[in-house]
Amino acid sequence: MSSSPQNEAEAREKMRELMSRPPSSRPADFVNPLEKIEQLLTCPICLDRYKQPKLLPCQHTFCYPCLESCADTLHRNLKCPECRAEHNIPYDGVKAFQPNYTLTGFLEIHLQATPESAAEIEEYIHRYNLERCKICDEKADCEPCAHCDRKACKECRQTHMDMLKRDMSRLLNQVKRLANRITEASDNLSKGVDMMTMNCETTKAEIKEYFHRYQRDLKKKEDNFLMEVDTFQATETRNMSNLRDVLEIESSNMSEAVSRLDAAIKGECSIEDSELVRMKNTFTEGLEYLRNFQPDADELFNRKLRFSAGDDAAKLPAAITTSGELCVLVPQFSGRYLPLEQSYLPRPFRLPLESDSYRVKSDERASMRDREADRTSSRHSHRNPEPDESSIRYRRRQQLEDEAWNRLRNSSAAPSLLTTSVTADSSSRTSPWAADRVTRSVEPTKSRPTSLIVPNTETPRTVSPASKPPLPPQSVERVERTEDASPAPLPQLPIRKPPLPRQQSSNDDSLNEKVETIRRAHQQRQDASRAASRAVSSEESEGEDFPVSTNRGRIRIVCRAASVNRDDGLMSMIPGTGTIINVPPPQHQLPASAPITNGTSEQVAIPVTHFTGEEDESDIVVPAWLQRRRQRFQRSRTNPDIQAQFTSARVQQLLAERQSRLDSSTTTDEEKEKLAVLRQRGRSASREAGEWRARGRPRAVFGRKGAKDGELNWPRGICALSGGLVATCDSSNHRVCVFDKDGKFVRQFGGYGAGAGQLDSAAGLASSKLRVIVSDRYNHRISVFGLEGDHLFSFGGHGQGNAKFNNPWGVAVDDLGSIYVADKDNHRVQVFDKNGQFIAKFGSFGHLPGQLNSPLFIAVSRVTHHVYVSDSSNHRISVFDPHGVHLFSFGEEGFHGGQFKFPRGIAIDSQENLIIADSGNNRIQVFDAQGQFVSSFGTWGGGAGQLKGVEDVCVTADGSIVVTDRENHRIQIF
């Protein structure tokens, strides 16, 4: 760049100016190495350059003349001026001491500053005083970076600015896509003004016709009503015109900002780094404004005025003074567009920016190290650990949601006449582009007053102090289980009493003695009870004659009094040894170079945490307390005396007679058969639910956040490939990653862009024979690849017509090769043949049966050919036949079994069970083919078997369930 020589010249001039100052007036961080060398060449006695430097036996050096003056010729010794050590003078005198050849060599160097050597010396001093870049850690000319506020070298600053420009390009494209909302709202306001004028004219005609019969008596009343209508018309016209003008100003501001940024990105005009950063923040806020901009058409454009004669029309002569009223008809549910709607949506609707992620990368690493240290220290302490950032974000989201629902319930009915004002949350918020324009116009002329039209601002939202924060998912789940099991009597579990509370010392000695006596007695009783229990357990273990079988098909670990916020430790078995080791939770990832033992001694790049399956658990070491418990149960079950009594013929006969009497006295034969069928069905359903709950322990967990091979950044769609492989959409890395059944990285394909074979935030994934179908969200198309990642063809485009998409999400393929696509923002499902030719479509926006609201994922049954669609924003699953005819729906919003909160991925196993990713509730739910709830597993968290924003699910050929744990950036296999 042309400014580089100028910057170097300024740096040299600054250095010369610092060197000309005395050392005391220089900055503390400036060092002249030549002055340090000069200090080393100065004699500490005469404070001048060494003259014939002599080295004493104590390794201190002085000038020969100085040593002559310090020598004691009478006693022939010399005391070192530095360390006061006494040395004998040689026979030949002080000159016989060893010369310091090193200092002599330095003194012989001629350091005269000539015009040729001055530049080299200045360059040397300049390099010596260079700072280290805070990013690449190299010495260079560092200046504050406008992006990250850290001193960085030129290359790192340029890298940051390039990253910022890429983010600005993406923001620019999104703003252009969403800009039509303001234009449409402005056009609708113009139509609303015309419709409102027509409505008012019609109302005037009705009023005139009604009051013409009572012209003389009701003339005054008529004038009053007409005046009210005119006032209403003027007020509404003024409000709507003002709002339209505001929207037009918003549109012009946005267009100006877009054109200015577009010119800056294309290089048509120069722009400062700080201005670019400010514009990036402005566009980020503007994009948030456009996302939340959803004007209520009924509230703004369809407010109708209607004249009502009243119920006392027959008594009009007597009630002429109180007859008639004007009513403003506000459509029902006019306030259904909540301003907080976007605040508690799942994170996939908020894509992080590359520059923001890079900006806080080092801070995140430091905070992760701090959290790791906090977790380690909390394991050894008795205090509850602090809630992490994710749990705080979860509670905040729940709090915002509860607040929005309370405001919706408590909202009043239609506002009264002439006191209402047009309030639209999405329209009344101040746009960032307007603020940007005001800032630019005020900066040149600060003294000139500026009048602005400021829309209504939102009042600050307050949370009632009496409202309790929502419970974490673990505690909520426990409450549900307790409520479900409340009708049945629960066995009384032994509860360990807490220790007596420590009281503060008082000045009353007698009271302190009593308290201490009570404390000692309580401690003695506890010690005695522990000793007795240990003696009983030791006697039981010594007198045991029955072997305990440890070869169990499944191990159930019961956690007693576990803290909700604790880190779940995982158990993993070392193959061939039969010993169990504690594996840290997957969020504490191992370094990339650490070897992972998974049955073979291979070294992989990404940690893959394997868990003991159900096949080989014969060598698992059972804890002592669990072994004693099983021994007691085994002993009571195999006691020969009790066994003989209960297996005798007489006892069995009495039991059979009692059962027959009960059956004959209460039921008929048909009822007996029904009861038997119901019992068998209940036992089967209970057994099936138990088997599904037992699968909540993952077999393997792999992946972590990053962009390297095997790393993931917001994984979304997933599908099973032939050969036991699994493919997933690495959404924020704009690629598809393929892993084997053990979690080892195999290959990847795709890449960021809009060209052939490139992707922009891939979401859905499906496989058919030798092809992989990927939904390319922001390119609004479907891309078809071969199994090896070679691009075959693409189809689609942005729009609302047939074969056009608006943010396509999930894809599915049936046995005939037909491709089903969930067209999310068009609220429909489109069907294509295997070559991408349009066949049919079904679904429309709404909440009625057969309508969809942001459909996300699709699954097609291979047996019934039914199409299952996750109707996400309606919190349900909609089922269609192959022709698009709606059959039924199941599910509703909630957190109980069978209820959903933004459901996403759907998979169908070999038994036609539906496995659904309940994203908002962070769990997997299982239903039968008729939509009846079977079981669920999973909860919120970062441990094994825990989920954060589960996205998609698939079933492999061996029956394993593979889940994309989106916000944990990993894959879990159950």
UniProtKB/Swiss-Prot annotation:
Compositionally biased region (Basic and acidic residues): 9-19, 437-446, 511-528
Name of the protein this chain belongs to: RING finger protein nhl-1
Compositionally biased tracts (Low complexity): 529-538
Chain's gene name: nhl-1
PROSITE patterns, sorted: NHL, ZF_RING_1, ZF_RING_2
Entry's Gene Ontology molecular function annotations: ubiquitin protein ligase activity; ubiquitin-protein transferase activity; zinc ion binding
Organism of this sequence: Caenorhabditis elegans
Biased composition (Polar residues): 416-431, 447-465
Disulfide cysteine pairs (residue numbers): none
Keywords of this entry: Metal-binding, Repeat, Zinc, Zinc-finger
Ranges of Pro residues composition bias in the record: 488-501
Keyword Metal-binding among UniProt keywords: yes
Disruption phenotype: Double knockout with par-2 mutant (it5ts) partially suppresses the lethality phenotype of the par-2 mutant (it5ts) at 25 degrees Celsius.
Region (Disordered) location: 1-29, 360-395, 416-548
Pfam families: NHL, zf-C3HC4
Lineage: Eukaryota, Metazoa, Ecdysozoa, Nematoda, Chromadorea
